[in-house]
Curated annotation (Swiss-Prot):
Catalytic activity: 2 D-alanine + ATP = D-alanyl-D-alanine + ADP + phosphate + H(+)
Cofactor, how bound (note): Binds 2 magnesium or manganese ions per subunit.
Pathway assigned to this chain's UniProt record: Cell wall biogenesis; peptidoglycan biosynthesis
Domain ATP-grasp span(s) in chain numbering: 104-306
EC id: 6.3.2.4
Disulfide bonds: none
Keywords: ATP-binding, Cell shape, Cell wall biogenesis/degradation, Cytoplasm, Ligase, Magnesium, Manganese, Metal-binding, Nucleotide-binding, Peptidoglycan synthesis
Species classification: Bacteria, Pseudomonadati, Pseudomonadota, Gammaproteobacteria, Enterobacterales
Gene name tied to this protein: ddl
Binding annotation for ATP: 137-192
Residues holding Mg(2+) 1: D260, E273
Identification of the protein by name: D-alanine--D-alanine ligase
Length: 309
């Protein structure tokens, strides 16, 4: 394989709220590449000017960045300009998928099931605004979930059980972004679907210790339970795969990625979000799903790299 003679930049760290997770993912990926005999170097984009990659003879980039400037199309557009092949989706799919509001609009235009929501911009937000929209918000019903539009890893998210706490929840979300979503909180079972190339890996059902799959449940807790196989019957699994692939193809996702879905108590699926650069930590779902498919972490990293374009 010619891949062995190449020089791979593992882009990690960065400046987003998810920097720490990116560092863990990135160094896991780096160590795996080195074990495979691949010449790879860790590049923290917080300190390293990306435009220097060609001058240092890097031939490909493995993007292990999460959040803004790494998962939002920014780094992808620079790498494309530099003519350096990179892992994951291209610029536009990355920019769309990190923006939950625009992703929802796109999916809705194809009649896919998205969780009912309201979108609010920071410049129009105040207590009077919430009063004005109280009827719209009440149509969602309590509880509701307030989240920044462009943050991952459940950062800045609050579950609101009473209207008295809604203003504070919105203020918290606005710390992290200039626009937020207020969504209907769906009680049910969450599923994550990993996609490698054009293949769907085994589906995982997520059962957090508490009601919500938050940052602690994702990265720190050992009490979150994962079921893979998911326990869905064949018909529901086929339905979920169809919805997922359609959603992924609509945003033009390529390489590898993950789509998160929740099934309510009436057995209806609702799309949550798409992730074009999933985590690769010890707690991460993508390598967990790959392992169930018989793909080791080391082989998985190689396969993702081979899909770089």
């Amino acid at each position: 394989m010619t891949i062995i003679t190449e020089k791979i930049a593992v882009l990690l760290g960065g400046t987003s709220q998810e920097r720490n997770i990116s560092l863990i993912s990135g160094y896991n990926i780096l160590n795996s590449l080195l074990k495979s005999g691949i010449h790879a170097v860790a590049i923290d984009t917080k300190d390293f000017p990306i435009t220097q990659l060609p001058h240092q003879k890097f031939t490909k980039a493995f993007i292990a960045l999460h959040g803004r400037d790494g998962e939002d199309g920014t780094i992808q557009s620079v790498l494309k300009y530099l003519n350096i092949p990179f892992t994951g989706s291209k610029t536009l799919p990355s920019a769309i998928s990190i923006n939950k509001f625009k992703t929802k609009l796109l999916w809705q235009s194809f009649n896919l099931p998205v969780v009912p929501y309201l979108h609010i911009n920071k410049h129009e937000f105040n207590k009077k605004f919430l009063q004005k929209f109280k009827k719209n918000i009440s149509l969602l019903g309590l509880p509701i979930i307030v989240k920044p539009n462009q943050e991952g890893s459940s950062i800045g998210i609050t579950i609101v059980y009473s209207y008295e706490t809604l203003y504070k929840a919105c203020k918290t979300a606005f710390i992290f972004d200039n626009s937020i979503l207020i969504e209907k909180f769906i009680y049910g079972e969450e599923y994550t679907i990993s996609i490698l190339g054009k293949k769907i890996l085994p589906i995982i059902r997520i059962c957090p210790e508490n009601t919500f799959y938050n940052y602690n449940s994702k990265y720190l807790s050992n009490r979150t339970t994962y079921f893979c196989p998911s326990g869905l019957n064949k018909l529901k699994e086929l339905e979920l795969k169809k919805i997922t692939l359609t959603a992924w193809n609509i945003i033009d996702g390529t390489g590898w990625g993950r789509v998160d879905v929740i099934m309510d108590y009436k057995n209806k699926f609702w799309l949550l979000e798409a992730n074009t650069c999933p985590g690769m930590t010890d707690h991460s779902l993508f390598p967990m799903s790959a392992k169930k498919a018989g793909i080791s972490y080391q082989i998985l990293v190689q396969k993702i790299l081979e899909l770089a374009n």
